[in-house]
Amino acid sequence: MNNTAFSKLAETTIVYIVDKIEEQDIEGIIDVDLHGDILNLDTENGIYVINTQSASKEIWLSSPVSGPHHFFYEQGKWKSRIGFELMILLTEELGIRFDKCEIF
């Protein structure tokens, strides 16, 4: 994947995360703050930081629940080297449903 394709895919993914949170977090429990390619989510469990790393073509997640993760894109999913999938992890930790197929 070239840099342009990665940038577009990563941006689409982060915007998708923001849209799903705003759509489903009716009570406004999660405070969403997006600046460029850095997304901060202030939750009851702490602050999540999601950002893109163009050089390594990864999305990085810092979670107050499960710690740091690096995700690479493969076969339609953002996966970590230890087997986590970004959307499944966010669903479990945030209680927001992310339909993986909608991104692509």
Swiss-Prot record:
Q: Which GO terms describe its biological process?
A: intracellular iron ion homeostasis; iron-sulfur cluster assembly
**What are the alphabetically sorted keywords of the record?**
Iron, Metal-binding
- Family matches, as SMART domains: Frataxin_Cyay
Please indicate which superkingdom the organism of origin belongs to.
Bacteria
Molecular function terms from GO = 2 iron, 2 sulfur cluster binding; ferric iron binding; ferrous iron binding; ferroxidase activity; iron chaperone activity
Kindly give the InterPro entries that the UniProt entry links to this protein. CyaY (IPR047584), Frataxin/CyaY (IPR002908), Frataxin/CyaY_sf (IPR036524), Frataxin_CS (IPR020895)
Q: Which Pfam families match?
A: Frataxin_Cyay
Question: What is one term from the GO cellular component aspect held by the record?
Answer: cytoplasm
Annotated S-S bridges: none
The similarity comment for this entry is: Belongs to the frataxin family.
NCBIfam families associated with the record? FeS_CyaY (TIGR03421)
Function, as annotated, reads: Involved in iron-sulfur (Fe-S) cluster assembly. May act as a regulator of Fe-S biogenesis.
PANTHER family on file: FRATAXIN, FRATAXIN, MITOCHONDRIAL
Record protein name field: Iron-sulfur cluster assembly protein CyaY
What species is this protein from? Rickettsia typhi (strain ATCC VR-144 / Wilmington)
